Amino acid sequence: MADDPSAGAFVFPELTRLPALAADLRFLGDSPPVLPATEAYCDRLLEVAFDRPAAFVAHHYTRYLGDLSGGQYLGPAIARAYGLDGDGHRFFVFPGVHPPAFRTRYRELLDRVTWPSDEQDEFLAEVSRAYQLNIAVLAELKEKWADRAVRNPAAPDDDIAGEGMPSEAQS
């Protein structure tokens, strides 16, 4: 999609996650089996992300703005829950990216896209679908792996209000 007139604007090398994800998997050891919700998510990406610019941007938007918003809290929360120190949650670290500034830049790019109404509708529908796919993946991961979390006595019992959240994620 890098060559597409509208979707190409959303290809950012600094968001590349494969090296971080590979490092996390190496650190964590054996690869767990792929869960059905993850397979469904991957199938959807393969179906739409290579030849439908609005769908590509919809999934890109959902993934990266989520990672640069709540993901900035989720990464440290996972590290606390599983007793990780540095390795094992690098997927959530974006070196050289200032999340609030990046989110602003991203939204400005979205505001400038000039898709016809059918592609605008596709974008909105695909964002909704991407959210649902993400929710299904997280639900399956919770069901499969939540019991493996370790209780960190230094972690607050209920940190969902934002205490302990990185300051850039709060903006």
Show the residue positions of the predicted features.
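Metal- and O2-centered redox machinery and metal/ROS homeostasis
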Residues: 1-171
